[in-house]
Amino acid sequence: MILAPVTAMAFQVGAWVGGPGQYPQPTQQNVQAFQDLQGTHLDLISYFALFDINDWNATAQYANVAKNNGSTLVVTWMANGYNAQDLVDGKADEYIRDYAKGVKGYGEEIWLRPLHEANGDWYDWGVGKAGAGNTDANVAEAFRHIVKIFKEEGVTNVKWVWTTNASNAGKGSTLTGNYPGDEYVDYISIDGYNWGKCQSWSSWQTFSQVFKKAYNALANINKPLFIAEISSSELGGNKAEWITDMFEHFATDFSRVFAVMWFSQSKEANEGDWALNTSQAAVDAWKAGIAKMKAIDNTALKPAGRASSSSFRLQDGKLYMQTSKALKASVVQFDYQGRVLWQSPVQHFTAGVHAIDTPKANAQSIYKLSVKR
């Protein structure tokens, strides 16, 4: 695997912004209200579109809200009424193709995440849904089928997002088994919630307890990773402290995460109090966490000097570097947010292949050569 130097991604903040009423949408008013609440701009705006019910025209109004706000719309594209084999067999092709044409005409970047949380038992495409006939194989094929239609229509402004739920539900579900392949995915993401004690079956869980298993399972997929849905109840613990802890993890052992999208809507009484502003303490913790992540972005160490002609690869868990000429340099390892994970001592390299002695070599990192004069 060749890991060429790439531009690091700044940490991004997004939300399903919620709002008044039972079915609030990301209108400009609701988006602005959430931005006022958190005291900063939203990079990503969440929207949920249902197959056949929400065509591109329904989506476009919110895509334009995002565009006018200087944000990117992230569409959770829900194939309600279809199982995976239905999609593979082309039963939704007309709707998908029309949507693709609309996205192409829109022209701005948009993120689409179809078939999200397929490792659960609650959606028609879920592997764990009893009697639905879904498998890891046909869910992955359904995802590829959707992407292929967009390619046939010449759509180039989509970032494809594959999402796993933080935990499996139902027989046969796996965290990564329905991954459609690197060719069909731009970003990977995780959805997860701390239900606290808002349900008879639930208990308070830390951020790590909710997300660590899925985060580790995605370690071998070499794509940028973000949290597409997240929230915490107030019941059973301290929501503000939970949020603070979440950002601490983003800065340490979850450093691969380049964006987080809060699901800010408290639904029916029998679900969760997911809205960000269930307490002022929770809002303050969110604001402080965002400020912390932005500060890390601004102070991340950048490679010194000028990069030489070099490439990196991983083999059997070891990092190898190939240079085209002799040089004096150190190797710097970054995460996707541009934060330094490790830096080697300065040493002299001859032209050729060199094994780099690093304790943290992995396929999720960015490697650069810092050349010294």
Which residues fall in each region the model found?
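Glycoside hydrolase catalytic-domain groove-lining segments
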Residues: T59-M78, P180-G236
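Active-site groove signature of glycoside hydrolases
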Residues: Y99-T135, N157-T164
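An active-site-proximal structural segment forming one wall of the substrate-binding cleft
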Residues: L87-P114, T135-E153, G177, F250-T252
